[in-house]
């Protein structure tokens, strides 16, 4: 029997790809783009993801779709029929890594149908399509419609690019990934309306948009049913949640907190001006949301923050750190910092360094500024040399190590609950405390994905974790 020219069995199989109660977008493309999935039977795919956790979540969704259509992931040594590359374009180095990854996959999997998606694909689709071996380039609006564009998997003489103007990118594609770790990454928001002077992400991912709270809660319940215990909320600008649904990030946090079976939530990264005292107070009293924050600072100098077109100053940032610590003295606070941006004079850097040095934060994620075409930052005259960028970066990395070491050392001798993660071959068993201290444990596969009480001992050999003893 056929329905709209498609085998009914294939139609039902394709319907099963989409979890219940997801977005209208998902429901619509089932109806509009029903396909005969028998062309995917016995096919093998390889997936390569670059960049942020959001990308990994989206790749996982693509993988689930292909798996339900009959495609399995390649095993070591096998050749793939389909190569999926999810790209990043946050820096010039990221662009280069994307090209290298594509070349490597084309070489290692001759004859495979190569699909490239992600930020680099949206920003430079024709450049990506020109890479030898690439068959299909999908923009931000199209990647959720992968099944529609795969066709019959025949190689193209030249790559086909299908993208949408950034102003027309409006679809929210639900995504959730597990990967090799115990924790899951749940995409709650996409896109950004901030247009900072140095950043191309709004041009790569479009305007801010989000899923519905009811749908996201349902995804969290599904994670719990699969045995998942920890979820990290991910997005481009998650504090801006609610633009498309009239809801708020605080309401989302409250709703997720009620999902039974999930032991831990972490907020991946949230802008300081969107991290409200209300959210901080809620996390402090919640048994499920962990005392762990990641807040992008980018610069500790107000003059540079203005050049960056950031929406806060150092006084506001310091007040957020103070509020967190007043509620949760042992909270882990990670901070993003960019060094060497245009306009960052030696005096401005020293001012920033002094401010960061005085902050009660745990870890710095240090990035060297990379010039991106089309950004407003290129209009700023003062340029920092690569040598100075390196020196400044190293100083902040040393400062970060000092802060992290002091934070860990303060907890030696204490008891804590650790969620044990799956150990990679040849690596020690490890897990994390509620406030994100990495703890190494004696090898015991029975502990995988288990919550255990440990006593925190001294540092491990390389100083990257504390040694834990089971209570």
Give each language-model segment a name.
Residues 114-115, 123-124, 225-347, 357:
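Conserved SAM/AdoMet-binding glycine-rich loop
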Residues 46, 379-471:
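Terminal RNA-binding accessory module
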Residues 3:
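Cationic, low-complexity basic patches in intrinsically disordered or flexible, solvent-exposed regions
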Residues 295, 336, 356, 364, ...:
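Hydrophobic, well-ordered secondary-structure elements that form the walls
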Residues 33-240, 278, 293, 315-326, ...:
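Proteins enriched for Cys/Gly/acidic motifs involved in redox and nucleic-acid/cofactor modification
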């Amino acid at each position: 029997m056929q329905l709209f020219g498609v085998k009914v069995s294939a139609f039902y199989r394709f319907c099963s790809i989409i979890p219940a109660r997801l977005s209208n977008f998902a429901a619509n493309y089932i109806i509009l783009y029903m396909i005969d999935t028998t062309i995917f039977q016995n096919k093998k795919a390889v997936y390569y993801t670059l960049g942020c956790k959001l990308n990994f979540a989206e790749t996982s969704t693509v993988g689930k779709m292909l798996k339900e259509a009959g495609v399995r992931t390649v095993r070591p040594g096998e050749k793939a029929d389909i190569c999926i590359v999810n790209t990043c374009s946050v820096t010039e180095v990221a662009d280069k890594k994307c090209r290298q990854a594509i070349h490597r996959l084309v070489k290692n999997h001759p004859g495979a149908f190569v699909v490239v998606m992600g930020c680099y694909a949206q920003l430079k689709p024709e450049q990506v399509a020109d890479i030898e071996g690439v068959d299909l380039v999908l923009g931000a609006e199209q990647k959720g419609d992968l099944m529609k564009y795969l066709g019959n998997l025949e190689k193209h003489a030249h790559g086909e690019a299908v993208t949408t103007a950034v102003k027309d990118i409006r679809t929210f594609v639900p995504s959730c990934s597990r990967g090799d770790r115990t924790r899951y990454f749940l995409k709650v928001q996409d896109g950004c309306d901030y247009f900072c002077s140095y950043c191309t992400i709004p041009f790569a991912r479009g305007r801010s948009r989000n899923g519905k709270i009811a749908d996201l809660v349902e995804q969290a319940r599904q994670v719990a049913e699969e045995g998942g215990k920890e979820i990290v909320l991910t997005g481009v600008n998650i504090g801006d949640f609610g633009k498309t649904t009239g809801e708020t990030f605080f309401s989302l946090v409250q709703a997720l907190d009620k999902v039974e079976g999930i032991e831990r939530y972490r907020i991946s990264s949230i802008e300081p001006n969107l991290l409200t005292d209300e959210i901080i107070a809620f996390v402090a009293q919640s048994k499920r949301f962990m005392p762990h924050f990641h807040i992008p600072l980018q610069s500790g100098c107000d003059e540079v923050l203005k050049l960056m077109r950031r929406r806060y100053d150092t006084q506001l940032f310091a007040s957020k750190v103070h509020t967190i610590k007043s509620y949760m003295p042992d909270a882990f606070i990670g901070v993003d910092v960019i060094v060497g941006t245009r306009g960052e004079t030696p005096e401005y850097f020293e001012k920033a360094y002094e401010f960061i040095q005085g902050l009660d934060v745990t870890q710095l994620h240090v990035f060297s500024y990379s010039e991106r075409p089309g950004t407003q930052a290129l209009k700023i005259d003062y340029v920092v040399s690569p040598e100075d960028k390196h020196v400044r970066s190293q100083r902040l990395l040393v400062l970060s190590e000092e802060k992290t070491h002091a934070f860990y050392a303060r907890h030696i001798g204490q008891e804590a609950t650790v969620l044990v993660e799956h150990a990679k071959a040849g690596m020690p068993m490890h897990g994390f405390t509620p406030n994100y201290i990495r703890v190494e444990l004696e090898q015991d596969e029975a502990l995988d994905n288990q919550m255990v009480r440990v006593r925190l001992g001294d540092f491990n050999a390389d100083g990257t974790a504390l040694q834990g003893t089971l209570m």
